[in-house]
Amino acid sequence: MRKRLIALLFLLGCFCLVVYFRLDDNAPTEKQQPSWSLVYSGRSPLGALGAYKDGFAACNGKGDLIVFLTGKETMTYKISEYSFSAPPLEKDGIVYVGDENGIFHAFSPERGELWSYRTGNQIVGGAVIFEGLVWVGSHDHTLYAFEVESGKILHSVDCGAQVNAMPVLYEPNRTLFLGSCDGKLRRISLQDGTLLGEIDLESPIPENPVLHDGIVYTLSYQGVLVAVKASNFQEIYRVNTLSGCFAPPCIAGDYVFVTGENGTAQARKKANGELSETWELGERINTPCAVGDSTVYAVSGMGKLHRWSYHAEKWTHDVVADFQTDCRLGCHLFGHDLLIPDESGGILLYREANP
């Protein structure tokens, strides 16, 4: 009798589970499994992430370089007494990065610091390398070109105001493009540092220009979006978008995404800047990241991950994750995953549940 009672209770329990999963719309399914996780927990806020060999790296508020390589333990190196917010650049095993005291470092994990140079103010933007020179901007209003081997300054360019952005290379013409807080987009020779031209957007340019299919897209703080031919620096169009733009534009397929500090996002046609769609999100959106031509992600300051998907000639928007932590930096695409630094020094990984 006891065995029969146990069997009956077991069957009743199975029946209740079946009823629960069929009737409860919120019951967990494969598609609703958690798609994000905390992959690194640090004690100091991280700066922007940068690619490092087959992994990535970041510097933190304690002056450390932290390297994450696939299948290996996380490595930490002390490279400065000051905090970092700029992304590290790795080339041939050497890391180039500027700190918030204005010191630009060339560092080898095997050999230590190779050279450094103190600029006149903090460095918050990333560096680029071309033919043995590393270029980086500083808040002291200057773009520097250092020899990668020696740290010797070969060129310096007056940018009129502080530089927050990373330069963008256009190798076919051996030029670079850089925005500055004096509101001007500059075209500069990679051969000798000569200023080849400038376009005035009339308000500070807080972030990087974006180069896509031979066109340079630049966004000012007041929301002026300018598209320029990289080959000859001719302006294609100029449109007013949003005010309070701290993030760079983001290219996805035939569209340019812009976001404002007031929580507004726009999709505009890449060809002419014409407005396609607008979303009022109610929270500040950090730098967006495109995944292919049909998906854009952006994390908010409150830690919500927003997604825009293009289908049937229309963009749709949804919130795919709530990290429940503050975030001040944008998303970074690493393979098929998104990496998002949070305010506390952690790194969150988001992966589509059913790609």
Predicted regions and their residues:
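Extracytoplasmic/lumenal domain signature
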Residues: 4-15, 19-355
